[in-house]
């Protein structure tokens, strides 16, 4: 069991790779928000592509050859859609910067999005992750790769966030609002996975 932290670091990932190797496990179970998903993706990719000795060598578009260790993702937030995207963000403590790693081989094998797992998320995090999804949707509309089909998803995401976010914050156990936000955050990140190839 690896307990990651917000904004996972290179050293978190290194510790996770070592823990996974010594565990004898066949898969990684990632439970939490975007940071948990990002940590799991980095651990899974490095484990199956040991020529990349640490996550720093994966910054940018990674040239891995093998798919990640199987990852089962159970998100507890609705904001990053990290459970279904090809990128992850890790903090390089030594150089004091965040690294974006892009790799189609890192997508979790299974993503189980259950709104009930989000019921106990504090109001402040519900709001913050919801605004993260909104930011991603707006970004998707203005990115160079946007086109009519990706715009359709981003506009729908913005409409759903407008409809459900306040209710999800004010009524944390409202299933309709939580499900709506779970779908909206997914739609808001579709542009990350190659918007011109939808």
Please annotate each region the language model reported.
Residues 2-4, 190-191:
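Short, low-complexity export/processing leader segments characterized by acidic and small residues
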Residues 12-16, 24, 39, 130-133, ...:
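General structural feature for long, well-ordered alpha-helical segments within catalytic domains
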Residues 5-8, 35, 122, 126, ...:
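Catalytic cores of large soluble enzymes that bind and process phosphate-bearing ligands
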